C-alpha cells in the first residue's frame, strides 16, 4: 500500500502541450495527415478537423453534420483574417498590425465562434487603448470642442450600470454656423447622413441601435436654445468637414462603445444584428426532424438537403413541396433530378456530348462552368501569363498534370463516376482507355466504321424531301443518320446519340421504350419515332427533316444507291415472295402511271410506308 501511495505523486510537464501543438503545426505546413481543405477567397488552407473543432464552435457543429466533406468553402471571411486565425489555432500567437486588420480578425473570430481568439483580441485592445487616450487628449484640445452636460448637446451613454459615459465629439470647420428653427431639420438630416460610427461596444444588454441613440441626442439638442452660434474661436479648422450648399456638415462620432447585441444565454455580444440572429439559432429548441431516419437538424436548409439526397425515393419531400415539380430519372443509372437543367448536364456524362468549346485551343467541355474555369487557365487565353506553362493541380491529392484531359481523367478516381458506357454488355468504366480495351478484348471491336446513309420513301428525290429510312441489319456496322446513330450487330440493335431534350417527354418512355423485343435496345430518341420488328429489319422513320433537306440532292441519291447495294438477296427475295394487298394496289397504280421502279427499292419503300402508318408521330 505504501508503494502505491508513493507512485501517486507524478511530475507535470507543461512543455508537453506546446510540443504537441508544434508538431501539429509542422504536419499542417507539410500537408501530412490533413483531412480538410478550407477555401477562403480562392485560397486553400490545409488543416486537421480535430484541431479546428477543438478551437471553434462553428467547425465543431459543422463537422458533426457534414463528416465526409473534403473541401469546405467559407464565405464572409477575408483571406488575411482567416490566415491569422489558423496561425493562432496552431501556434497560440496572434500577430496583427493596425486597427483595420484587428477589426477584420475580430469579425472573423466572431463568425467562426473562436472564443480564445476573441479573448486575445480583447487583451490587445485594452493594452493599446490606455496609452492612446493619454496621447490624444492633449493634442486635440485645440482642434476639438468636447460637449459637456451644460451645453446644448447632451452627453449620452447606452443603458448600462457599469458603462462609462460616451464621449461625442463634434468636428466643425472654419466659419460660423447659425442654426434656426426653420433650418434645424435639414441640418439634422445632413448630419445623420454623414455620421460615422466607428466602434459600438457595450457591456449591458440592449437591443437599441446607434441610430436610435443619435436620434435621442438630436431631440435633446432641440430642447435647448432655438438659435445658437458657434464661432471659429471655439475650434480650429478641420479638413474632414464637407460643405454642401454653403452649410458645413457636423459629423458625430461614437468612440469605443462596446457591442450592442448581447446574448443573455451565453454572455456573448455582437456588433451586427445578422451575426446575433444567426447565433440565437444555436440556442433555439426548435429542430427539424426527418420522419424516416429520425435525424434532427437545427436549420431547415440542412433538413431539406438531407431529404432530397437520401429519402427522395421514400417520399421524404412533402407533397406540398413536390407539387408542380417533375422528376426526371436517368435511364442509365436511375438517378433522379428535380430540375431539367441538372438532368441534362448529367446525361452528358453518359452520351459524351460536349457543346461548349474553347475559342483558344478548341477543346470542348460538357459544362459551361468547366469552360469558364478552363479559360482562366488556358495557356493561350487571357488568364495565362507569357512564358509560363499551364499546370493543373488536384486539390485532393496535390497531383499535377500538364494537360486538361489527364487532369479530368484523374478526377474520376476521387469522384467515383463511371461515364464510359459499353452499349453491348451494359458495363461502365472510369477511363476511356478501359472501355476501348474492353471492346477489343470482349467484343473484338478495334475500330468503329461510321457511315452516313439516308434513304427516301420515293425514288424521285427532287420533288419530295427525305423524311424516313429503312436500315437492313448488318453485323459489325454502324449507321449514322441525321441526329440519330444506329449500331447493329448479331446480338442486339442500339439506337444512340439523340437530343436529350426529348427525354423529358413521358411519351417517349411510354410509347417507344416498352414492348420492344428483348434483343433490341433503344437508348435515345430524336424528333421522330422508332419501330422494331422480330425479323432482320429495323425501321427508323420521321427523322429531322431540316437536317436532311440541307444535304444536296446528289448526296441523297448516292446514299440511297449505296444503301440499296447492301441488301442481301435473301431479304429481297423474301419481300418479293410475300407481297400484301397494299403492295398489289401500289403496283397497279405505278403501272398505270408508267413508273419503272426496281423491285428492291419498291418493296423496301412499301415496307417503310406501312411501318409509318402503324405508329403516331411524336411532336
Swiss-Prot record:
Cross-link (Glycyl lysine isopeptide (Lys-Gly) (interchain with G-Cter in SUMO2)): 289, 295
Keywords recorded for this protein, A-Z: DNA-binding, Isopeptide bond, Metal-binding, Nucleus, Phosphoprotein, Repeat, Repressor, Transcription, Transcription regulation, Ubl conjugation, Zinc, Zinc-finger
Protein species of origin: Mus musculus (Mouse)
Example of a GO biological process term: positive regulation of transcription by RNA polymerase II
Pfam families: BTB, zf-met
Start and end residues of each BTB domain: 34-98
Family that this chain belongs to: Belongs to the krueppel C2H2-type zinc-finger protein family.
Phosphoserine found at: 231
Expression sites (tissue/organ): Ubiquitously expressed. Predominant expression is found in the developing central nervous system with strongest signals in the forebrain, midbrain, and hindbrain areas and in the neural tube.
Gene Ontology molecular function: any one: DNA-binding transcription activator activity, RNA polymerase II-specific
Name of the featured protein: Zinc finger protein 131
Annotated spans, Disordered: 574-619
PTM field: Monosumoylated at Lys-598 by CBX4 and UHRF2. Sumoylation may potentiate ZNF131 inhibition of estrogen signaling. Sumoylation does not interfere with ubiquitination. Ubiquitinated.
Gene that this sequence comes from: Znf131
Motif (Nuclear localization signal 1) on chain: 137-148
Keyword Lipid metabolism found: no
Amino acid at each position: 500500500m505504501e508503494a502505491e501511495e508513493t507512485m501517486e505523486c507524478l511530475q507535470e510537464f507543461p512543455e508537453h502541450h506546446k510540443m504537441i501543438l508544434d508538431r501539429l503545426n509542422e504536419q499542417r505546413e507539410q500537408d501530412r495527415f490533413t483531412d480538410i481543405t478550407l477555401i477562403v477567397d480562392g485560397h486553400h488552407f490545409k488543416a486537421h478537423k480535430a484541431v479546428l473543432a477543438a478551437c471553434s464552435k462553428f467547425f465543431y457543429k459543422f463537422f458533426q453534420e457534414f463528416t465526409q466533406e473534403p473541401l469546405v468553402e467559407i464565405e464572409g471571411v477575408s483571406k488575411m483574417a482567416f490566415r491569422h486565425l489558423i496561425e493562432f489555432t496552431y501556434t497560440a500567437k496572434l500577430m496583427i498590425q493596425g486597427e483595420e486588420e484587428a477589426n477584420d480578425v475580430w469579425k472573423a473570430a466572431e463568425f467562426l465562434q473562436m472564443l480564445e481568439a476573441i479573448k486575445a483580441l480583447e487583451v490587445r485592445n485594452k493594452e493599446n487603448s490606455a496609452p492612446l487616450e493619454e496621447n490624444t487628449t492633449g493634442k486635440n484640445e485645440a482642434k476639438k470642442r468636447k460637449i459637456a452636460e451644460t451645453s446644448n448637446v447632451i452627453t449620452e451613454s447606452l443603458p448600462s450600470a457599469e458603462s462609462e459615459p460616451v464621449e461625442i465629439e463634434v468636428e466643425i470647420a472654419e466659419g460660423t454656423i447659425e442654426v434656426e428653427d426653420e433650418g434645424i431639420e435639414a441640418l439634422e438630416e445632413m448630419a445623420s447622413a454623414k455620421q460615422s460610427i466607428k466602434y459600438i461596444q457595450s457591456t449591458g444588454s440592449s437591443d437599441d441601435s446607434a441610430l436610435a441613440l443619435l436620434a435621442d441626442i438630436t431631440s435633446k439638442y432641440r430642447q435647448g436654445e432655438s438659435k445658437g452660434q458657434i464661432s471659429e474661436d471655439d475650434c480650429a479648422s478641420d479638413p474632414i468637414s464637407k460643405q454642401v450648399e454653403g452649410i458645413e456638415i457636423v459629423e458625430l462620432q461614437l468612440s469605443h462603445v462596446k457591442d450592442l447585441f448581447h446574448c443573455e444565454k451565453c454572455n456573448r455580444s455582437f456588433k451586427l444584428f445578422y451575426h446575433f440572429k444567426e447565433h440565437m439559432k444555436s440556442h433555439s429548441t426548435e429542430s427539424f426532424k426527418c420522419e424516416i431516419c429520425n435525424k434532427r437538424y437545427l436549420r431547415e436548409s440542412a433538413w431539406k438537403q438531407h431529404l432530397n439526397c437520401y429519402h427522395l425515393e421514400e417520399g421524404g419531400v412533402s407533397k406540398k413541396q413536390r407539387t408542380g415539380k417533375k422528376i426526371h430519372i436517368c435511364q442509365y443509372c436511375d438517378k433522379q433530378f428535380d430540375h431539367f437543367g441538372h438532368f441534362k448536364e448529367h446525361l452528358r456524362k453518359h452520351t459524351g456530348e460536349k457543346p461548349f468549346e474553347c475559342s483558344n485551343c478548341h477543346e470542348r467541355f460538357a459544362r459551361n462552368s468547366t469552360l469558364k474555369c478552363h479559360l482562366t487557365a488556358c495557356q493561350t487565353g487571357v488568364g495565362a501569363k507569357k512564358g509560363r506553362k499551364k499546370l493543373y493541380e488536384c486539390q485532393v491529392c496535390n497531383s499535377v498534370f500538364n494537360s486538361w484531359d489527364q487532369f479530368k481523367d484523374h478526377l474520376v478516381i476521387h469522384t467515383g463516376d463511371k461515364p464510359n458506357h459499353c452499349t453491348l454488355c451494359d458495363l461502365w468504366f472510369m477511363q476511356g482507355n478501359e472501355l476501348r480495351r474492353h471492346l477489343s478484348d470482349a467484343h473484338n471491336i478495334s475500330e468503329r466504321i461510321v457511315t452516313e446513309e439516308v434513304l427516301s420513301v420515293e425514288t424521285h428525290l427532287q420533288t419530295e424531301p427525305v423524311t424516313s429510312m429503312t436500315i437492313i441489319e448488318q453485323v459489325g456496322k454502324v449507321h449514322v443518320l441525321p441526329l440519330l446513330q444506329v449500331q447493329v450487330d448479331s446480338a442486339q440493335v442500339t439506337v444512340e446519340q439523340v437530343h436529350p431534350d426529348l427525354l423529358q417527354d413521358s411519351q417517349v418512355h411510354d410509347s417507344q421504350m416498352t414492348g420492344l423485343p428483348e434483343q433490341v435496345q433503344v437508348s435515345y430518341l430524336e424528333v421522330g419515332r422508332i419501330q422494331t420488328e422480330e425479323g432482320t429489319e429495323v425501321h427508323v422513320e420521321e427523322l429531322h427533316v431540316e437536317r436532311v433537306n440541307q444535304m444536296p440532292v446528289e448526296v441523297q441519291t448516292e446514299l440511297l444507291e449505296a444503301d440499296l447495294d447492301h441488301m442481301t438477296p435473301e431479304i429481297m427475295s423474301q419481300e418479293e415472295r410475300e407481297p400484301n394487298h397494299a403492295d398489289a394496289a401500289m403496283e397497279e397504280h405505278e403501272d398505270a402511271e408508267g413508273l419503272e421502279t426496281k423491285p428492291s427499292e419498291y418493296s423496301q419503300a412499301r415496307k417503310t410506308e406501312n411501318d409509318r402508318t402503324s405508329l403516331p408521330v411524336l411532336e
